[in-house]
Structures are given as structure tokens and as C-alpha cells.
Amino acid sequence: MNILMIAPEPFFEPRGTPFSEYFRIRALSALGHRVDLVTYPFGEDRQIPGLRIFRSWRPPGIRAVKTGPSGAKLVLDAFLFLRVLGRMFSGQYDLVHSHEEGSIMGVVFQKLTRTPHLYDMHSSLAQQMGNFQFTRSRLVIRFFRIIERISLKNAASVIVICRALYDQAAAVTAADKLTLIENFLDDRPACTDEGRVRRLRESFGTGARTIVMYAGTLEPYQGMPLLIDSMERLDASYSLVLVGGTAEQVADLRRVLAARGLAGRVVLLGRQPAADIPAYLRAADVLVSPRTLGTNIPLKIYSFLASGVPLVATDLPTHTQTISPDIAVLARPEPEAFAAGIARAAGAAGKEIAARALDFCRRNYTPERYQELVAAALAKAVAGSPRRTG
């Protein structure tokens, strides 16, 4: 099939949804399909057989876009829609595959051309408004909830990335249109170079202390206040290494740590190349996911589980819909409980849990399984549309 994919993100940048889009395209390519990707004017080109990238025009004064909703994103989406319209009238497509708020553009494409529409629902658009502290306006939140409902009702097929989104979508549209595809793929090879891992640990300057590591964005919903409060409950034999965050976020956090007397126990590395993350994970003694808001599974969880390093995560639906106590230490989102979870993971129990997690990933999170699920979602899109494709 010839597929038009709408991605209102900077493709490719090493963060949540672009990672997911990348692996969707990889799977579609392996299945023999051709993809025309319409995306933002930022990001790295990726070479995948059958992929063509069409970037929207860059609005004056906008040179980047942060994670989550923003005023800049609204402007970029308007320019993206113009690019989508251009492709709609210049290309022949068998399917339109939309991501996130691009779903409403997919609905327009579907209505005007009778092309089957596959909606890739990575999150609740309405919930994002609160998670990213973008707005508390009931009117704005209601607007995005309406967009979400229109997209769900009109799509011939819907991909959801976690059980919470599945339940939410099933309350709006037919459950037989839904396909649950967790974002478990990661094509970065595991780090087996022990010398490199040792040098990384030495570069942290933490000496013989137990290294607790978080790798990911520093957005409000990720739970940094909980993690910092938990570090205060642990003795000085523990150090925290934070990988990720913008320069501004890192500077703000550095000031907070200095004010609380923790600057000497926390290493702030900022963003690191995506290809290097497996080595950083292996350099840790304990990995943490202190997320406190939202219901989506953090994409980073899958690489954490596959790292061979014990994981501590908050005992909230964002984690528990996928993670069991058999493969991670689950702790209440309270400083004392989370600190106790870190201490437990640093001991003998942590090694056993990490081994079970690694085995679980090897058995369940395979490229073959992922490709089967993508093929199933495509089949539903074709079967559920009045226009049949070939």
C-alpha cells in the first residue's frame, strides 16, 4: 500500500512519539508498504526503504519545539496541515496513518478522499494539557476531548499504546477497531563493553557510591520532586545521576539541589546521544521511573526492563498496567516508600528482579510480535473502511 503518515512532531528526535513513529515506519517497510511522512521542519532524516519525508514549512521565529503542547506547536500544526493538503491532492494513497493531534487532519483527509484512516493514539490529548501544565482552561481541555472523540469515532482502525488508553478508547468507539501495541522495540544494541561502562561510572565522579539513575525528560509529570525527596531519605552512600532535560531545566534543577544541600550527591548530565543511552543504563546500580502523573506507559520503561539493571517505579497505573512486582520494585509515590524501594533494588533482591525482567523482555518483546500487531491494525483499517485497498 501507499501510506500517507501525518506526524506532528520533529522526526526524528530521540524522544517518545518520534521513537514510536520510527518503529511504525520500520514495521510498515518490512511488510512491503511505502510511506510518505509529512512532519515538522525539524529533526534528522532517517533512511528506511520505502520512506519519503515531506517537511512542512518553518514559521518565522520558530526554530525548535519542546515536548508537549505549546503555542509554537499550534502554529506548526497549521503549517503541517497545509503540507498534508498538498500531498492529498498530489498523491494517490491507500491509507492515511495519523499520530496524536494529526488525527483530526486524518479525519479531514478521510472525509474528502474516502481513504481509510488509521489513528495512532499515543496519549490522551485532553490529559496532556494537565500533564504538561499547559492549561487548566476547561474550554481548551473540552476542545481537545472533542477532537479525540471525533478521531476515535471516524477512524477505521485505532492503535493504542497501553491498556489505559485502550479502555478510554473503547468507551468511545467499537473495541474491535482497537489494536494494543506497546512501544517495546529498541534497535540500539545492549552495551556489552564493560570497559566503557567502567569509564562512564568513573566519569560521574561518584566513587564507590551506589548509582541511582533516571534517564529521560524532566517534564513536570515525570516526578522529579518525588525522586529528590526520596534521595534525602537515603544515606550518603547513594548518588543520583540524571540523564536528560533541556539546558534550562537542568539549570533550574541545579538551583533546587543547591538550596537543599544535595548538589554533591546528584550528577546532572543533560541530554546525551540516544545511541549512548544503553551504556549509561548499564553504568547504573538502580534505575528509577518516579512518574506521578498520567496513565501512559513511559516509553523508557521498556529499555529499562531490558537493561539487566533493577528498576524501581511508582506503584501507579502508568506503570502497573505493564509491570508486575515480579520484574520491578513497585513503590508508593511517597518519599519514604520510594527510598525504601531503591534500597531494596540495590540489594540481592534487585539482581533477581533484574534477571527476571530481562528474561521477560526476551520472550515477549520481539520484532516479530511487533510486526504482527502492526499488520493486524492495517487489516482492520482496510476491513473497516468503505473504500477497499489493494
Tell what function each PLM region has:
Residues M1-D45, L226-L234, L316, G390:
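N-terminal subdomain of nucleotide-sugar transferases
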Residues L4, T206-Q222, I228-M231:
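Conserved donor-binding/catalytic core segment of Leloir-type glycosyltransferases
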Residues F23, L82-F89, I104, V108-L112, ...:
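Membrane-proximal helix-turn-helix segments that form the acceptor-binding/catalytic region
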Residues A156, R265, A279-N296, V309:
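Acidic donor-binding loop of glycosyltransferase active sites
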Residues A164, F184:
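Carbohydrate-associated surface elements
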Residues A251-A275:
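Nucleotide-activated donor-binding/catalytic signature segment of Leloir-type glycosyltransferases, i.e.
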Residues P325-E336, A343-A349:
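Conserved acidic donor-binding segment of nucleotide-sugar-dependent glycosyltransferases
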Residues G347, K351-A379:
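A charged, aromatic-enriched C-terminal amphipathic alpha-helix characteristic of glycosyltransferases
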